[in-house]
C-alpha cells in the first residue's frame, strides 16, 4: 500500500534500468529495499525464425544496501542506438525480428561497450571471473564473447567460456524472456 511502483517496457534494458533506479533509491534511503521484476513473454509468428527462441518467465531481485548474492559495481559502460532489429508493436501479439541483423548489432554493441569499458577503467579479461549476457538465445552471447576472448590468456578464455556455458543452463530451459534473460543467467 505504501510503496512506489513504476513499470518500464523495454525488452533489452528494462530490468537493468529498474536496478539502476533501485541503486539510486537505496543511496538516498539506505535502510530500504527495492523489488525489481523482469518479466516478459516472447512470442513470434508460427514458422518464423524467432519461433524457436520464444519463451516466458520472470526474475525477481531484491536490491538492498547489504546484498547477499551479488554486489553491484559502479563502473559501467553503455551504448544506445535506434536499431530496428527487433520490435513488438502495440497492435501485435507477436514480435518481429531481423535475426541476422540483430546478431550483427548485438556483437557490435558488445565489442563497442567492451572497448569503452577498457578505455575508461583499464580493464582486461583477467579482471572478470565471469561475464553475464542478455540472451535472446543462448548462442548469441557466445558469439559476442568470442570476439574478445583472444585478448586474454588461455586461463582467461577457459574460465570465461566455462562460466558462460554454466550461465546458459536456465535460459536453454526457459527460452527468451527478454530483459530478464540477463539475470536468469
Report each predicted region and the residues it spans.
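Short coil/turn connectors at secondary-structure junctions
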Residues: 2-4, 28-34, 56-58, 65-69, ...
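Active-site pocket-shaping loop/turn-to-helix segments
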Residues: 6-16, 50-52, 93-112, 173-177
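Flexible, glycine-rich active-site loops centered on histidine and acidic residues
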Residues: 27-60
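Condensing-enzyme catalytic core mediating Claisen C-C bond formation in acyl metabolism
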Residues: 47-108
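Phosphate/pyrophosphate-binding loops at sites that engage ATP/ADP/AMP, CoA/4′-phosphopantetheine
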Residues: 111-129
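Membrane-interfacial loop- and helix-cap regions that link adjacent transmembrane helices
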Residues: 119, 130, 135-136, 141-162
Amino acid at each position: 500500500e505504501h510503496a512506489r511502483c513504476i513499470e518500464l517496457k523495454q525488452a533489452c534494458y528494462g530490468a537493468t534500468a529498474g536496478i539502476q533506479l533501485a541503486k539510486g533509491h537505496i543511496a538516498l534511503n539506505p535502510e530500504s529495499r527495492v523489488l525489481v521484476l523482469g518479466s516478459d513473454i516472447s512470442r513470434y509468428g508460427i514458422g518464423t525464425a524467432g519461433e524457436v527462441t520464444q519463451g516466458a518467465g520472470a526474475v525477481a531481485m531484491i536490491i538492498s544496501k547489504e546484498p547477499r548474492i551479488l554486489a553491484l559495481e559502479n563502473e559501467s559502460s553503455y551504448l544506445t542506438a535506434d536499431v530496428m532489429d527487433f520490435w513488438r508493436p502495440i497492435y501485435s501479439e507477436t514480435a518481429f525480428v531481423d535475426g541476422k541483423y540483430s546478431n550483427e548489432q548485438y556483437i557490435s554493441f558488445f565489442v563497442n561497450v567492451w572497448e569503452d569499458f577498457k578505455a575508461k577503467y583499464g580493464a582486461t579479461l583477467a579482471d572478470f571471473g565471469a561475464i553475464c549476457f542478455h540472451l535472446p538465445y543462448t548462442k548469441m552471447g557466445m558469439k559476442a564473447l568470442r570476439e574478445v576472448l583472444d585478448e586474454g590468456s588461455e586461463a582467461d578464455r577457459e574460465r570465461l567460456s566455462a562460466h558462460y556455458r554454466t550461465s546458459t543452463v536456465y535460459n536453454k530451459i526457459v527460452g527468451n524472456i527478454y530483459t530478464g534473460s540477463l539475470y536468469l543467467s
